């Protein structure tokens, strides 16, 4: 049906928008599908190629870092989050995920600093701030 066709055409854009991007290309869209399937190794490979082709895309670096972190490469992930935030210091996804990394590696003050910045960027709250707040509280309870 035409409805299904339209959905299939726009679904990569909906997935990409979930990660803060409104104009994904094929590599980026493929990486997001891998991430949603928790296939982080495949996502990392695609995002490595993507960031080579689009080195100024903060969101590409963010998802590359996220995939690296999910695979246990915490030091590399930290460098990649820094790269993403150097390109766009207001990248909410990068601030959230970097904050999670800080909390995960026992640096609660840095995690709280990222949360404070997110609260400034979204005074009426946003998913990134709520997710980071929840993650920090979850770590603190352990």
Where are these regions (language model features)?
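Alpha-helical segment of the N-proximal tetratricopeptide repeat
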Residues: 22-53
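Start-of-helix register in tetratricopeptide repeats
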Residues: 25, 59, 93, 127-131
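Register position in tetratricopeptide repeats
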Residues: 36-37, 70-71, 104-105, 121, ...
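Conserved structural position within tetratricopeptide repeats
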Residues: 51-52, 82-86, 120
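Canonical tetratricopeptide repeat
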Residues: 63, 97, 131-135
